[in-house]
Amino acid sequence: MNEKAKQLLGELEMLGERSDFWYEDFWITRSPIGGYAVVSVKRTLTEHFSNAQRVVDFLSKYDKSLGKTLYEVKL
């Protein structure tokens, strides 16, 4: 995991329940049922993730500058 991915992971973990975060073309917020909700700007894609690492893994598909994520390295 590169520095950009680590920084993003840290920012996501600091989100409060009523906070949100914009990254590229995605709106990320803490879900009231736990975890994180990720919605695309055009609202054509909505995903729910149990933890911040999964969010970073998902975003790395769209932003190659995040590098290889923990999930990809384990594969």
Give the positions of each predicted feature.
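Acidic, low-complexity, intrinsically disordered interaction modules
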Residues: 18-63
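Negatively charged, low-complexity tracts enriched in Asp/Glu with abundant Ser/Thr
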Residues: 1-22, 69-73
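Generic detector of intrinsically disordered, low-complexity, polar/charged segments
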Residues: 7, 13, 31-32, 64
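Enrichment for repetitive, rod-forming helical segments
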Residues: 11-13, 37, 61, 75
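Short, surface-exposed secondary-structure junctions/capping segments
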Residues: 58-75
